[in-house]
């Protein structure tokens, strides 16, 4: 009998993973020069041992200057800036769902936890960060990506040492039905949190 796969067949994963990575690299304008797809399955004494999820890596090559390799310390007056896409009901609980066996949660929860890429938006955010880094004086005090738990993670780590004031009503909303919890915890992609020197806010706004 044909084996039933929970989501995709191995062949579909290999093809779609490669296509997806290449598509994102093309839209972002960055060559995809390395990558891998790793899985494992072994049967012994009528017992099957296998990775529950496929591991995929993709990458390129970049560089950074020594001046920009360490984050600065937040100071009173620094402005918290969020760059990138709007907030949607995307990636909710992504960190939790990715850490348990496939099928543990309902399909609805798992689908909400899946992140959706936006290469064009990532390119826009990248261009701003690169422009600031290539100036004679980098006005970025600290920077943090929006990973697991979205704004909750990113913004709290930016102001961890001193605390800060975040205006939720200024966070860009793409879906007006989002609750407060969904606004601060979603993992909508291609967003970056920055601490900016207060006197440079208008300059950053012009570049963005």
Predicted regions and their residues:
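Glycine/proline-enriched, intrinsically flexible loops and inter-domain linkers
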Residues: 1-208
């Amino acid at each position: 009998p044909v084996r039933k796969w929970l989501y995709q067949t191995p062949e579909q994963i290999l093809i779609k993973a490669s296509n997806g990575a290449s598509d994102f690299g093309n839209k972002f304008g960055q060559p995809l020069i390395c990558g891998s797809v790793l899985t494992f399955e072994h049967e012994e004494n009528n017992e099957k041992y296998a990775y529950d999820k496929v591991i995929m890596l993709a990458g390129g090559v970049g560089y950074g200057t020594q001046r920009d390799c360490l984050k600065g310390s937040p100071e009173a007056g620094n402005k918290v800036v969020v760059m990138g896409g709007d907030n949607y009901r995307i990636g909710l609980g992504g960190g939790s769902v990715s850490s348990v066996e496939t099928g543990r949660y309902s399909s609805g929860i798992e689908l909400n936890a899946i992140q959706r890429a936006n290469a064009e938006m990532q390119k826009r955010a990248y261009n701003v960060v690169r422009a600031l880094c290539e100036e004679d004086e980098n006005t970025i005090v600290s920077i943090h990506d929006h990973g697991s738990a979205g704004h909750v993670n990113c913004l709290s780590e930016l102001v961890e040492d001193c605390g800060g004031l975040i205006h939720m009503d200024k966070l860009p909303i793409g879906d007006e039905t989002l609750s407060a919890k969904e606004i601060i915890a979603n993992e909508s992609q291609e967003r970056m949190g920055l601490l900016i020197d207060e006197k440079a806010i208008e300059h950053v706004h012009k570049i963005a």
